[in-house]
């Protein structure tokens, strides 16, 4: 009896156990803050784990209190240290601090979860009422305390940096990528935070930016020069996606640019008397025609308008040829004109159905008509 009584593990009072645990937590925080502190040894980690384990399996089960303490440790550190460090910084310095604090937070949660891992097994998994895991508690603390306060300011700084890059300035793309990853990771497995708190505002700003560009460029540039700028803008925006935006953003971003730089100015650009679509056909500007086709290909309704302009042009040329040529040469000239348009359809418009139909229509209206007249 006496030997059994002696073999029972000593009951750890909560204050005593927590005091020892707190020493390990203090060391972890000092390491995160960059203060001189040796790294954790396995023996230290195992000691902390053992204390917490014993406090859960003994007669006085402190698992619920430890679970609550785990949350409070993270909340206190965040409120007392993390938030003040963020509030005192601005612009890119604030973004760098935010990235640093997010990375530190993940490290803190990772280490604390190792120390408190038995809480997950003993309390969280056995609870009749679902309660968050230690990882979920840790991430929620950052979401509620840091993300909710800082995301709006961070969004504005990132959008300002994107604007600078669009104007030709170099920016820290890696920093922007790391900041946007915070939006993604705080979505808890979804892209809701990224889409609602950043992407929607960035797309709105993009539309405004390119609307202003379109207004200026349509006044300053010929149609070919304008289209070169549009092509370059689309290329640069797609590069932005590869460097720091989430891949889900690309189709939305491209659509915004297409709408502002192509859809909204179709008539102004393509029907310009001096440098529009008809003028490019007249001057045999195949590269410029190919560019227009490539740019409007993803916009079916506007590509149809381009095909209509092609039809209008070849109709006018066909009518003019019939009026000017004599009966002996008309048929040959029409064949030559038709062959010329075949080159455009194949080389510039990739034999697209819309343009192919225009060529067939030309054959029906002019060549067959001329054949029957003869």
Swiss-Prot record:
Top-level taxon of the source organism: Eukaryota
Single Gene Ontology BP annotation: ubiquitin-dependent protein catabolic process
One Pfam family in the UniProt entry: Cullin
Gene3D superfamilies recorded: Cullin Repeats
InterPro entries in UniProt: Cullin, Cullin_N, Cullin_repeat-like_dom_sf
GO molecular-function terms, A-Z: ubiquitin protein ligase binding
Protein family according to the UniProt entry: Belongs to the cullin family.
Protein name: Putative cullin-like protein 2
Organism: Arabidopsis thaliana (Mouse-ear cress)
